[in-house]
Amino acid sequence: MDRTPIIAALTALSLAACSRPLRVVVGSKNFTEQVVLGEIVAQQIERTLHVPVERKLDLGGTLLAHQALVQGDIDLYPEYTGTALTAVLKLPPPQQGAGDAAAVFATVSAAYLRQWRLVWLRPLGFNNTFAMIVRGETARAEHLATLSEAARAHPWRMGAGYEFRQRPDGLDGLLRTYHLRTEGDPVSMDLGLLYAALGSRRVDLIAANSTDGLASAMDVTVLDDDRHYFPPYQCAVVARQDTLARFPNLRETLEALSGKISDARMRQLNYEVDGRHRPAAEVAAEFLRTLVR
């Protein structure tokens, strides 16, 4: 039997496999924190594994980023447990809202692996929950500290990001839980415009994020979610299982970041970009340098 054709075919397949670009594609959603985290992850891979990294940052909202990961357009991106639970898996939040962060993480980890062969790595260390924010002068004048107190006060001119209006853990459920009244329809806008709208008095109450850098730079008050409506939103890198298999040291490389970013640290990183207008890549590089001191 002439084995030459078989050997030639196997050789061609082997050469084709070897010629495939060995790279990791890092994605992110389309707001500052995600782009900063995408850069941190990308640079961590580059400096540790020394493999090429393609960046597909600023992809869009949650469902677009998730679909890109499932389809293999990207290899990994940072996600939040509460977002995965409610917006992606369509599961109800824990009855106690803020609930057990470890239980929510276990639920989304198991479901992602079972349904899509996606792996949740250990959390980065911070919890970016939604934050309902008013101007500081408003909170002081009306003696507001909680969402329940805001609900009893008066109807609110409200601003929110586009995704928050559509999410099961978003606007509609919040209004029902607190019997919060709005003055007209809430104004939808990009997340980066919320604080400007609040400062210019276009709106009086915004649905923002607890790790927003601008929150610490302005005179604002974050109203306490006293009915624990929002679930935990621990942030972690989610990766394709086949990508982790192709790069045996990738998981260890990324989990070296686990627990390294506190709420306050993430807020500061965001402020460096949004408040001081520094490039996300520069802020990410500076952060990584502090880890090796």
Name every feature range the model reports, one short phrase each.
Residues 69-70, 150, 197-199:
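Hydrophobic residues within well-ordered alpha-helices
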Residues 21-34, 51-57, 154-160:
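Short, well-ordered beta-strand elements
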Residues 54-67, 184-196:
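Short helix-initiation/N-cap motifs at beta->coil->alpha
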Residues 62-64, 68, 73, 78, ...:
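The structured alpha-helical core of multi-pass membrane proteins
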Residues 16-17:
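C-terminal motif of bacterial Sec signal peptides marking the signal peptidase cleavage site
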